[in-house]
Amino acid sequence: MNGAKRRKVAQDTPRNTKPVAQEKPARAEPKPSSDEESEEESATLEEPSAEETAVDAPKKTFKDLGVNDALCEACEKLNYKYPTPIQEKSIPVALQGRDIIGLAETGSGKTAAFALPVLQALLDKPQPLFGLVLAPTRELATQIGQAFEALGSLISLRCAVIVGGLDMVPQAIALGKKPHIVVATPGRLVDHLEKTKGFSLRTLKYLIMDEADRLLDMDFGPSIDKILKFVPRERRTYLFSATISSKIESLQRASLRDPVKVSISSNKYQTVSTLLQNYLFIPHPQKDVHLIYLINEHAGQSTIVFTRTVWETQRVSILLRTLGFGAIPLHGQLSQSSRLGALNKFRSGTRDILVATDVAARGLDIPSVDVVLNYDLPQDSKTYIHRVGRTARAGKSGVAISLVTQYDLEIYLRIEAALGKKLAEYPTEKEEVMAFQSRVEEAQRIARIEMKSFTEERGKKGSTLKGGRGKKGGKRGRDDMDREEG
């Protein structure tokens, strides 16, 4: 389907009857959360209480935080008018030379929160290989590199992005030019540390781990341990994440010195007040028809559909395109160029539906997402928070709707318990939903045919879809560790 924007699917309407105008039931506006918790820790900066924020106070500027004129000018050019809460709390602490554990929801401005202090320190004492940023996915690493280049545009910053799935030779050449900042996925960075002559992190001054909880998952643990042996002990270390875990606490004890915990979220499973969350309890065989109904209801809006597997991501995207929607898949079996292409099309609005595995749920810079649809529920509450955090960002409103079948009840109840509230059911009329049934069944038939070739291609050892270069043999390498789905 080459059309850029999605169009509404015509419902099957009985002959000689006029379509009934669909009046959507009034939906309650989301209410701001009133549950505030406080932690009394000497080295913890928490978000102010409602009483404190009720007092009208002038907004702080980046200059007020201690950011120098050159970087303030870069912020102004990027339309960063005022610091976000995580920036306001972490930048002054970072400029004091402290290690930081930063806890904030996705979309809160974490990248600038750690980039600005690093760039300011670099301006004071310029040197190559000054800072290293580790990210769990290739897309997030690329995004962070772009943010550093934008913020450092007025100071001649050199930044190298080192990720798996791309040729190592150009990356080695980029490292040979002695960039100020290196942004990398763990597996590929270890490859260069072990194989690229002349590349060393002995002079490193800053180590940043973004989405730190995922970096410390089992797959990345050995690579992180190796990297820590290559970096000097005398350095500043920042860990930024949406959640904290026992693994992060272990890393804190091992590699951070007297860190300050900066948090703007008092609840581990808190979602923003502008996010309207609903569920639909449906029979499992009716997931597709209800998905199409919801997509049609939100036609023209930027939407992410989350699925659990690579196979389902591909099938659902084919189903949607067959029905005339501008959908594009994003998963770890795509080549790096295809993944970046999918993200760029979605960001630019060329495609307004992204069907994705959880590779898209964390950290990626997608400025405006109106709707999140959980076609498959995630396996845990933390992943649910990260998924729905794709929408309702930067004060905007958003909608998140989850399809819940008889097989998902246990997971769904755990999610509600973590959120501390019961979600409202999304109002539907059965007749309106089932009006799509015949067209959905035909699209399912076409999708099954197309998925045969996808399954055959995926079955080849080391294959990478859409032009990617596979490895010989089935051995799992570090590039696979930089890829979330396999």
From Swiss-Prot:
Question: InterPro entries given for it?
Answer: DDX47/Rrp3_DEADc, DEAD/DEAH_box_helicase_dom, DEAD_box_RNA_helicase, Helicase_ATP-bd, Helicase_C-like, P-loop_NTPase, RNA-helicase_DEAD-box_CS, RNA_helicase_DEAD_Q_motif
- The question of whether Nucleus is a record keyword is answered with yes
Q: Which residues form the Helicase C-terminal domain?
A: 286-434
Q: Which residues form the Helicase ATP-binding domain?
A: 91-262
Renumbered to this chain, the Acidic residues biased-composition regions fall at: 35-54
Main location group = nucleus
Q: Give binding positions for ATP.
A: A104, E105, T106, G107, S108, G109, K110, T111
Q: GO molecular function terms here?
A: ATP binding; ATP hydrolysis activity; RNA binding; RNA helicase activity
Task: Please list the GO biological process terms of this entry.
Answer: rRNA processing
The broad enzyme category this protein falls into is: hydrolase
GO CC annotations, alphabetized: cytosol; nucleus
Q: What is its EC number?
A: 3.6.4.13
Locations of Basic and acidic residues compositional bias? 24-34, 451-460, 476-486
- Which SUPFAM superfamilies does the entry mention? P-loop containing nucleoside triphosphate hydrolases
Its keywords, alphabetically, are: ATP-binding, Helicase, Hydrolase, Nucleotide-binding, Nucleus, Ribosome biogenesis, RNA-binding, rRNA processing
Q: Which SMART domains match?
A: DEXDc, HELICc
Please write the reaction equations for the catalytic activity of this protein: ATP + H2O = ADP + phosphate + H(+)
Name the family the entry cites: Belongs to the DEAD box helicase family. DDX47/RRP3 subfamily.
Function of the protein: ATP-dependent rRNA helicase required for pre-ribosomal RNA processing. Involved in the maturation of the 35S-pre-rRNA and to its cleavage to mature 18S rRNA.
**Domain remark in the UniProt entry:** The Q motif is unique to and characteristic of the DEAD box family of RNA helicases and controls ATP binding and hydrolysis.
PANTHER family on file: ATP-DEPENDENT RNA HELICASE RHLE-RELATED, RNA HELICASE
**Protein name as it appears in the record:** ATP-dependent rRNA helicase RRP3
- From what organism does this protein derive? Gibberella zeae (strain ATCC MYA-4620 / CBS 123657 / FGSC 9075 / NRRL 31084 / PH-1)
